[in-house]
Swiss-Prot record:
The gene is mtnA. InterPro entries: IF-2B-related (IPR000649), IF-M1Pi (IPR005251), IF_2B-like_C (IPR042529), Initiation_fac_2B_a/b/d (IPR011559), M1Pi_N (IPR027363), NagB/RpiA_transferase-like (IPR037171). Pathway: Amino-acid biosynthesis; L-methionine biosynthesis via salvage pathway; L-methionine from S-methyl-5-thio-alpha-D-ribose 1-phosphate: step 1/6. It comes from Syntrophomonas wolfei subsp. wolfei (strain DSM 2245B / Goettingen). This is Methylthioribose-1-phosphate isomerase. Belongs to the eIF-2B alpha/beta/delta subunits family. MtnA subfamily. Catalyzes the interconversion of methylthioribose-1-phosphate (MTR-1-P) into methylthioribulose-1-phosphate (MTRu-1-P). It catalyses: 5-(methylsulfanyl)-alpha-D-ribose 1-phosphate = 5-(methylsulfanyl)-D-ribulose 1-phosphate. The record marks 155 as: Transition state stabilizer. Keywords: Amino-acid biosynthesis, Isomerase, Methionine biosynthesis. The keyword Zinc does not apply.
Length: 346
């Protein structure tokens, strides 16, 4: 499976996902500011991968840093805030940064060289854990799919959005290994086209049957009886089950409910925000108008037209059939169940 990022010679090599599917381009980041720019610019995307990338970037900030004492504490806080400001909706980012801060606090008395080594090791741990977690999500979720399943998805919740294997696409991969998948319907996912550029490319590489749809074809496809389940990823899940995911997810959930199709969310426990009670509290990132006005530099509309471009929407819990995580399947009523799962995941 393709590597999204890897650490070598005190530099982070990242796969620039903006270049896919036309080119496979790795970029070398030698400074934390370059990693920040890569996250903001969507060269790296997907909630789990954003978190791990930020962890590596934070570790990189201490490679060669010789400060000690209070100056080092101030430097750590500044670097952490730099990464925390990149993508406000993806809670995995803050979870990973908290993991890194815990390691820093436990080891800040050590030499600069040893502290840097331990921070890098924690980032590596996060990377390996994410792959294991995604494989577990896949195994749990495939149980929900029968033979000949036709599954619809949006955005990219696959290996490209994680450190490997994927969440929603992890479920599809695990089901495909058991010959359960007849077709994956991939919504193109305007405005950045993660579905057409990334999900289709991933599934094509794995020889999993896939058909591309424009986003506004989803409802009609469901009405024809061609969809057995909808599976999406998540960027943040509130403790009542309300879920933030790529813009367009809410529309799919409404359509699935109307047509009597199960709607599943696949996400690790690190995507749950234990401090948020319901979806209205989740911050929704708004991105550049140019993402909507243009595609690959070509203008699609009046160049100065006003644009509303939220990157995510909120799917209320009553539209979700079940949430698939690494420990198992969470079913309604979500509030009580999520609290139990949260305690078990501590």
């Amino acid at each position: 499976m393709i590597r999204n990022l890897y650490y070598e010679e005190q530099a982070l090599m990242i796969l620039n996902q903006n270049c896919l599917p036309e080119e496979l381009v790795y970029e070398r980041c030698e400074r934390p500011e370059e990693v920040v720019a890569a996250i903001k610019g969507l060269k790296v995307r997907g909630a789990p991968l954003i978190g791990v990338t930020a962890a590596f970037g934070l570790a990189m900030a201490f490679s060669g840093y010789s400060g000690t004492g209070e100056a080092r504490d101030v430097y750590f806080s500044r670097m952490k805030e730099l990464f925390a400001a990149t993508r406000p909706t993806a809670v995995n980012l803050f979870w990973a940064l908290e993991r890194m801060e815990r390691v820093y606090r436990e080891n800040h008395h050590l030499s600069p060289e040893e502290l840097a080594r331990r921070l890098c090791q924690e980032a590596q741990n996060l990377y390996k854990e994410d792959i294991r977690v995604n494989e577990a999500i896949g195994e749990q979720g495939q149980e929900l799919l029968g033979e000949g399943s036709r599954v619809m998805t949006i955005c990219n919740a696959g290996a490209l959005a994680t450190c490997g294997y994927g969440t929603a696409l992890g479920v599809i991969r695990s089901a495909a290994r058991r010959n359960k998948i007849e077709m994956v319907w991939a919504c193109e996912t305007r405005p950045v086209l993660q579905g057409s550029r990334l999900t289709v490319w991933e599934l094509w590489q794995d020889k999993i049957p896939v058909t591309l749809l424009t986003d506004n074809m989803a409802g009609y496809t469901m009405s024809l009886g061609k969809v057995d389940a909808v599976i999406t990823g998540a960027d943040r899940i509130a403790t009542n089950g309300d879920t933030a995911n790529k813009i367009g997810t809410y529309s799919l959930a409404v359509l699935a409910k109307y047509h009597g199709i199960p709607f599943y969310v696949a996400a690790p426990l690190s995507t749950f925000d234990w401090n948020i009670k319901q979806g209205g509290e989740i911050p929704i990132e708004e991105r550049s108008a140019e993402e909507v006005r243009t595609i690959k530099g070509s203008c699609l509309t009046v160049p100065v037209v006003d644009v509303f471009n939220p990157a995510f929407d909120i799917t209320p819990e009553h539209l979700i059939t079940a949430i698939i995580c690494e420990k198992g399947i969470i079913r309604p009523p979500f509030g009580a169940a999520i609290k139990i799962w949260g305690r078990e995941g501590e």
